[in-house]
Regions:
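Intrinsic disorder/low-complexity polar-acidic segments
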Residues: 71-187
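Charge-rich, low-complexity N-terminal segments
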Residues: 1-67
Length: 187
């Protein structure tokens, strides 16, 4: 048996602190899940629906609950025909469907909330971009101003996706860039 009373008191105290931290984290997970069920879920739904209505944004807000304590609230801009299609024959066209993007608030395994942007994509046309993580929050951190910022970032990113082009001026690189404005006397 290990003697824990000898000069190992520092190590034992370190271990005790780590155990206390672990217990606190596990208790927080339970508390975060309770807050989600008791109030946060409904608060997020209400705020997102309010912003959709207030801004006249064509979107749906719904809860996806395939697994307990991993629910997600999804603000979706919906699905539409992309305007592109494959002609099967003179009478039939197979339309490519465009998913317009979504803003997601999802519970994580530890009760915290991850906020994600799913970018638009067109089925069978390239690969969808991976979701963008806006942030991970403890329930008490999600105040109303955060929701407005998340929505602004979502709309900006979706707008940039829709307005994609490669006409952005190229960034010049090279040795002489810093010297381009210098007047060099000719010999």
């Amino acid at each position: 048996m290990i003697d824990l009373t000898s000069n190992n008191s520092t190590e034992l105290n370190n271990l005790k602190r780590k155990v206390a931290t672990y217990k606190e984290v596990v208790a927080n997970t339970r508390a975060y899940r309770d807050v989600w069920k008791e109030s946060l879920h409904d608060k997020i739904l209400e705020i997102l629906k309010g912003m959709v209505d207030n801004c006249s944004l064509e979107a749906t807000v719904e809860t996806k609950s395939g697994m307990e304590n991993l629910e997600a609230i999804v603000l979706s801009l919906g699905d539409v025909k992309s305007g592109m299609w494959q002609e099967i024959n003179s009478n039939i066209k197979r339309h490519l469907i465009k998913h317009n993007g979504s803003l997601i608030y999802q519970q994580l395994f530890n009760g915290k909330i991850i906020v994600l942007i799913n970018y638009p994509f067109i089925e069978n046309y390239g690969q969808p971009r991976p979701p963008k993580t806006i942030g991970i929050y403890r329930p008490e951190e999600l105040k109303e101003p955060f929701f407005v910022r998340h929505m602004e970032e979502f709309i900006s990113d979706i707008t940039n996706w829709e307005d994609y082009d490669d006409d952005e001026p190229s960034k010049r690189i090279g040795f002489d860039i810093n010297f381009s404005n210098m007047n060099v006397a000719e010999e």
